UniProtKB/Swiss-Prot annotation:
This is Glutamyl-tRNA reductase. InterPro entries: 4pyrrol_synth_GluRdtase, 4pyrrol_synth_GluRdtase_dimer, 4pyrrol_synth_GluRdtase_N, GluRdtase_CS, GluRdtase_dimer_dom_sf, GluRdtase_N_sf, NAD(P)-bd_dom_sf, Shikm_DH/Glu-tRNA_Rdtase. During catalysis, the active site Cys acts as a nucleophile attacking the alpha-carbonyl group of tRNA-bound glutamate with the formation of a thioester intermediate between enzyme and glutamate, and the concomitant release of tRNA(Glu). The thioester intermediate is finally reduced by direct hydride transfer from NADPH, to form the product GSA. NADP(+) binds at residues 189-194. It holds the Pfam family Shikimate_DH. The gene is hemA. Its EC number is 1.2.1.70. Pathway: Porphyrin-containing compound metabolism; protoporphyrin-IX biosynthesis; 5-aminolevulinate from L-glutamyl-tRNA(Glu): step 1/2. Possesses an unusual extended V-shaped dimeric structure with each monomer consisting of three distinct domains arranged along a curved 'spinal' alpha-helix. The N-terminal catalytic domain specifically recognizes the glutamate moiety of the substrate. The second domain is the NADPH-binding domain, and the third C-terminal domain is responsible for dimerization. The keyword Oxidoreductase applies. It catalyses: (S)-4-amino-5-oxopentanoate + tRNA(Glu) + NADP(+) = L-glutamyl-tRNA(Glu) + NADPH + H(+).
């Protein structure tokens, strides 16, 4: 049995290839059935995200194994083999185990240390459990990777610092306000970045969020998810005074929030401070706003400096994480080797028990026919001894003929001979 990990990711393949190799959720069962129909495959898990498509397999060794699996992947997706080979990586046994642990821990992600990948790996594993998982070693490898990912997050600072613009914006807000549960947040825009910001804020117990967007329909979908109120962009001037925090990310070519608008809001708030985080490019907030007393304006460049600093911290934590992965990989491979020995022991014991049962049955039959009990028992003992020592004796003789002293010593040790 061999463990394999093969696939492509954001480091080896452009998005144009990654999207062609991805497995859609509605066809995943079909793909797993097709994969497990391959004669060499004993068990399989398919991990398919926007940044990677990987197959984790338990296989029987055979000639042209790599070619057979690449051919299956190309046939399934109707790809040219040469196009795929240039971007494909292939890991076996120790390297496959280490790779999965690194992936689950966020060490192989586009955003170093990002936590979402662990959930994606867990889902891929759960999907494979629906009648597709046939290899206990593969199952154990995934379970081990989950515990390793948890250990990495617990024992290192890999996830402690923000390295995405959305997360950095929320981290900044948490640093300035003692508690986010009592503040009102105005989100301007409803795109992907604002979606991430809104979800982060909800996780930090923000009770009141207002979403201002050009189109109400898109904003309403997000508002329903996070429990926010939706307003039009034209209502910002009137509602701005309610907001303690404003986070803006639109595609507007011109600023949406001007200096005069913020001045009026501050006056209505009796100069209670406001935090404005402008993630947009071009900017949504006029730079002059930053000159106002009690208005604290941060641009995407300010966030980028925070992210760069935090990324350096994550890279330092990643070194510690790699040490954990190496240690856990070594322990898993030791367990795997022990499992291999256990199977050999089971086969050897089963073989011995089969000989015992066969000879005992013959002896009992002879006794039932009235044979001499002492002679029958002596014959049983003699035959049982000869049958059990036959194979080891042949191995000892062959090692002696070959002059293989190392093998002779191993056999002597195995047989308990001094």
């Amino acid at each position: 049995m061999t463990l394999l990990a093969l696939g492509i990711n954001h480091k080896t393949a452009p998005v144009s290839l990654r999207e062609r190799v991805s497995f859609s959720p509605d066809k995943l069962d079909q793909a797993l059935d097709s994969l497990l129909a391959q004669p060499m495959v004993q068990g399989g898990v398919v991990l398919s995200t926007c940044n990677r498509t990987e197959l984790y397999l338990s296989v029987e060794e055979q000639d042209n194994l790599q070619e057979a699996l690449i051919r299956w992947l190309c046939d399934y997706h109707n790809l040219n083999e040469e196009d795929l080979r240039k971007s494909l990586y292939w890991h076996q046994d120790n390297d496959a185990v280490s790779h999965l642990m690194r992936v689950a821990s966020g060490l192989d992600s586009l955003v170093l240390g990002e936590p979402q990948i662990l959930g994606q790996v867990k889902k891929a594993f759960a999907d494979s459990q629906k009648g597709h998982m046939k290899a206990s070693e593969l199952e154990r490898m995934f379970q081990k990777s989950f515990s390793v990912a948890k250990r990495v997050r617990t024992e290192t600072d890999i996830g402690a610092s923000a390295v995405s613009v959305a997360f950095a914006a929320c981290t900044l807000a948490r640093q300035i306000f003692e508690s986010l549960s009592t503040v009102t947040v105005l989100l301007v825009g409803a795109g992907e970045t604002i979606e991430l910001v809104a979800r982060h804020l909800r996780e930090h117990k923000v009770q009141k969020m207002i979403i201002a967007n050009r189109t109400r329909e898109r904003a309403q979908i997000l508002a329903d998810e996070v429990g926010a109120e939706v307003i039009a962009l034209s209502d910002i001037d009137e509602r701005l005074r309610e907001a303690d925090i404003i986070i803006s990310s639109t595609a507007s070519p011109l600023p949406i929030i001007g200096k005069g608008m913020v001045e009026r809001a501050l006056k209505s708030r009796r100069n209670q401070p406001m935090l404005l985080v402008d993630i947009a490019v071009p900017r949504d907030v006029e730079p002059e706003v930053g000159k106002l007393a009690n208005a604290y304006l941060y641009s995407v460049d300010d966030l980028q400096s925070i992210i760069s600093h935090n990324l350096a911290q994550r890279k330092a934590a990643a070194v510690e994480a790699e040490t954990i992965v190496a240690q856990e990989t070594s322990e898993f491979m030791a367990w795997l080797r022990a499992q291999s020995a256990s199977e050999t022991i089971r086969e050897y014991r089963s073989q011995a028990e089969q000989v015992r049962d066969e000879l005992t049955a013959k002896a009992l039959a002879a006794l039932e026919q009235g044979g001499d009990a002492q002679a029958i028992m002596q014959d049983l003992a003699w035959k049982l001894t000869n049958r059990l020592i036959h194979a080891p004796t042949k191995s000892l003789q062959q090692a002696a003929r070959d002059g293989d002293n190392e093998r002779l010593n191993i056999l002597r040790d195995s047989l308990g001979l001094e």
